[in-house]
Amino acid sequence: MPRTPKNQNLEQNTQTQSLTDLVYPESTGIPVPEYLGTVDKLPDNTEEVPQPKRRGRKPNPKTKARKEPALEQNVQAETEPEFQEKKQPVDGIAAAEKRLAEQYGVANIDAIAEPIYTGEQNYKPAESTEENAFVSENTSEAVIPQNGDMAQAQAENQGEVATDQNADPNAQQQGEAQAQNGEGQDDRRFNNQNGKFNKFNKNNKFNKNNRNNRNFQQQEEFVDDSATLPAPGSEAILKAKENWLKFRKLSMSELQELAVQKEVDFRRMRKQSLNYILQSLENEGNIIYTEGVLEVTPQGHGFLRMPDQNYQTSADDVYVSQNLIRKFNLKIGDTIEGLVRTPRDQDKYFSMRRIDRVNFEEPDKMRRRVAFEYLTPIHPEEKIHLEWNETEYSTRIMDLFSPIGKGQRSIILAPPRTGKTVLLQNVTRAIAKNHPEIILITLLIDERPEEVTEMRDIITDIKEKAAEKGIEIKAEVVASTFDEPPEHHTRVANMVLEKAKRLVESQKDVVILLDSITRFARANNVVIPHSGKILSGGVDANAMQFPKKFFGAARKIQDKIRTVKNEDGTISEEVQKNGSLTIIGTALIETGSRMDEVIFEEFKGTGNMELVLDRRIAEKRIWPAIDVFKSGTRKEERLLTLLEQNAAWNFRRGSQNETETGIMENLLKLMSKLKTNAELLAVLSKPKV
């Protein structure tokens, strides 16, 4: 409330002011008889109370008038000379009240007048009775209240405060809010939820808030509108998935040609955004289908990273709200399929509209899954057959002398230029042909770009040939070439590892082909904060933790046996197949680098299968350059039959006196005559005399 000027005296007694107002028709509207007359104003004997001096800058009267205009107007009205002349002395009030009560035939003036109140009391309107009905009908102005009750009285005059049942119960609260802010003027601190006046998310003049790490303004939360969308698995969804796969294979120039045909402005559009826009025009109901791997941010929301972009961040990534993440118990690395919503007015990204599948299963199953760390690892027991072509001798040799099982932790020790890349390509073809149920991920770190393109062409060719036979192959290539920073190498490896873990939690068999562990460890040595403890070769003491974590994640999960009660009342046991994670990684040796030797020594005893490539065999242009004597698998009796074990043992015993080159030449000659390993086993199982 503004300060009262010193040259204007206000009435200090609030009760006296209220009683005086009852007599005048200007304040209450009650007709006053002529014989009452008027009372002369007594001299003002109130003393002026000195106001304390205010330090600092003087307040701007215009600013205060804007904040509390109603209060300022009432104060000015009270301080006017005309208003001061209307004041009645205290002595003439009693006689006036008595004559007024006799005129209306009541015992007390309180029966016809509203109760007297002060600014410190809570205002309560008088009850509606027959005696004061005349007063309420002819009343035009309310009694001027004091301080905060002014807004309440104004609300009453406007009909906001009523005594009937149809009155607004929140009118009093609204009046109080108006009194605080000045005629209902909204406080700007409560208007902007994301602006600089927000109490819990204050931003500076650059609209940044580095203190609380809330620079990213989350998009509008998920709204369940699945009732208006086609059901999962319907023809519309299947067609949308086909269009997504079709547009995904097209290049940017081909997508732009389609955009021109459909009259779409593709300027400033990236490939993924243009893909979504063309999908919405092609699909029924303008629905958009997508698939990606979830990455959860520290703020709680997430984004879908695309394998085509090697799981790197992009402006076209799909936004996943916190509600969806909490609803389905989603984690980083989950493979999500569903429908996408186009950006709204203030949205920056495409957002997830509905989740249809998670890790190729129903989303509700993810709520009951067991974390990867709590699964029980065992030795591999199910063999992965690598024999797929009679002319590919490398996989036939591996299938017999160094078998690989589901959950194997395999390491290929290869000097430079010994054919490790070709060997991985043949293993990829063998797994895709013999085990289409396995999810295959090829991870290339610090490799040459042309090798990445070659591997992707191989995967595409495998998928197309399998699709012609009606078989769906789940395989992909994720790469980070040598011209990218080390941070990209570690990020890609982490996303692939988390994706594989989530698939294993969903009882899936996953195989990761890693090329190579050595380059992966080099990149991690550059990225991590140095501990100050340097090993030989310049390797930090903590540099091998993440590569070991990656390589050590390979395991076979123990199957779960549970009892099931049949319909006839008998109890039987049911075996629930769990998943497995197989990692086949390559390690560089004989490179002349001390760091590579240290990395090799760290991983030497961690794998349970080793395949050694010999440089001397490769120099003589003999492929594959496999050292049969140094290669082998731990617990191979769990993977090989007794016939296969005897055949491998007889061949090794009969070739002890020969060189590595001679052993490989003899084995290749024998395989060229025999088309399958079954025929080879029949020959090798016979002991030499």
From Swiss-Prot:
Residues 52-65 have a biased composition (Basic residues). ATP binds at residues 405-410, 417-422, 448. Keywords: ATP-binding, Helicase, Hydrolase, Nucleotide-binding, RNA-binding, Transcription, Transcription regulation, Transcription termination. Disulfide bonds: none annotated. One of its GO terms (molecular function) is ATP binding. InterPro entries: AAA+_ATPase, ATPase_F1/V1/A1_a/bsu_nucl-bd, CSD, NA-bd_OB-fold, P-loop_NTPase, Rho_factor_ATP-bd, Rho_RNA-bd, Term_rho. Residues 287-362 form the Rho RNA-BD domain. Signal peptide: none annotated. GO terms for biological process: DNA-templated transcription termination. Residues 1-20 have a biased composition (Polar residues). Residues 1-90, 151-213 are annotated as: Disordered. SUPFAM superfamilies: Nucleic acid-binding proteins, P-loop containing nucleoside triphosphate hydrolases. Its EC number is 3.6.4.-. Residues 170-183, 191-213 have a biased composition (Low complexity). Facilitates transcription termination by a mechanism that involves Rho binding to the nascent RNA, activation of Rho's RNA-dependent ATPase activity, and release of the mRNA from the DNA template. PANTHER family: TRANSCRIPTION TERMINATION FACTOR RHO. Belongs to the Rho family. HAMAP family: Rho. Homohexamer. The homohexamer assembles into an open ring structure. This is Transcription termination factor Rho.
